A protein has these predicted regions:
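Catalytic alpha-helical scaffold of carbohydrate-active enzymes acting on polysaccharides/glycoconjugates
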Residues: 2-122, 127-196
Length: 196
C-alpha cells in the first residue's frame, strides 16, 4: 500500500517594493530606479503562476508603489490576493519620529482602502525594522497581524512590547500578553492554514 501523503502547508508572500526601498535610501539615480522597475516586469508573471496553481497569497505594498503602478496593484486585488501594509514610502519606522510613523501608517491604510475597499489587516515593516512605537500604532489602527519578526519558523506568536536591548548585558524581553497582535506570515481565516 502506498503511504498517504501528508498535507503540507506553505506560506508564500511577496513584497512589491518596486523602487521604493532604493529611493528611501537615497538611491535615486537611473540605475537603482531601473532596478526597482523590474518588480513591475515580474509581477504579471507571478500573478500568472499563482493563478496556474490556484494559490492565493499576500502582497505587501508601500503606498507610493500603489500610486506608481495602480493597474498592477488592481490586478493583484482582482486576482483575489490580500494586500498588506508595507509603509508609505518604504522608510523603516525605526528611522522616523513617532508622528511621522503614524502619518505614514494612516496614509498607507487610506491608500490600501482606496485600492481594495477595506483597511488592511496585515503589516510588514519596511526593511523589517519596527520602531518602539510600531506595535502600539498597529494596535491603534486595528491590525490583526504583523509579519516582520522572525523569532519562530512556523508557529504564530504574540508580538511583545517593551523589550530592552542592552549591549553590555542580557536582553530583557517585554510582555506579549496584552497586545493581541500576532506575528505570522499569513491571515489564518483567509488561508485556512494556521489555527490560533
Amino acid at each position: 500500500h502506498p503511504r498517504p501523503m501528508k498535507r503540507l502547508i506553505a506560506c508564500i508572500t511577496f513584497d512589491f517594493d518596486a523602487m521604493s526601498g532604493l529611493v528611501a535610501r537615497g538611491l535615486t539615480s537611473p540605475t537603482p530606479v531601473s532596478r526597482g522597475e523590474f518588480g513591475a516586469v515580474a509581477l504579471p508573471r507571478i500573478l500568472a503562476l499563482m493563478d496556474r496553481f490556484g494559490i492565493k497569497t499576500s502582497f505587501f505594498i508601500p503606498g507610493v508603489v500603489i500610486d506608481t503602478y495602480p493597474a498592477l496593484c488592481e490586478a493583484i486585488v482582482k486576482a483575489g490576493h490580500e494586500v498588506g501594509h508595507h509603509g508609505w514610502s518604504h522608510v523603516p519606522p525605526a528611522n522616523l519620529k513617532p508622528e511621522e510613523e503614524e502619518e505614514g501608517l494612516a496614509r498607507g491604510i487610506e491608500r490600501i482602502r482606496q485600492l481594495t475597499g477595506k483597511a488592511p489587516t496585515g503589516y510588514r515593516s519596511p526593511s523589517w525594522d519596527l520602531s518602539p512605537d510600531s506595535v502600539r500604532l498597529l494596535l491603534k489602527y486595528g491590525f490583526y497581524y504583523e509579519s516582520s519578526m522572525m523569532a519562530h519558523d512556523h508557529e504564530p506568536y504574540r508580538v511583545r512590547q517593551g523589550d530592552k536591548v542592552h549591549v553590555d548585558r542580557g536582553m530583557e524581553f517585554g510582555d506579549a500578553s496584552g497586545t493581541g497582535l500576532l506575528d505570522i506570515r499569513m491571515v489564518p481565516e483567509r488561508h485556512n492554514a494556521v489555527k490560533v
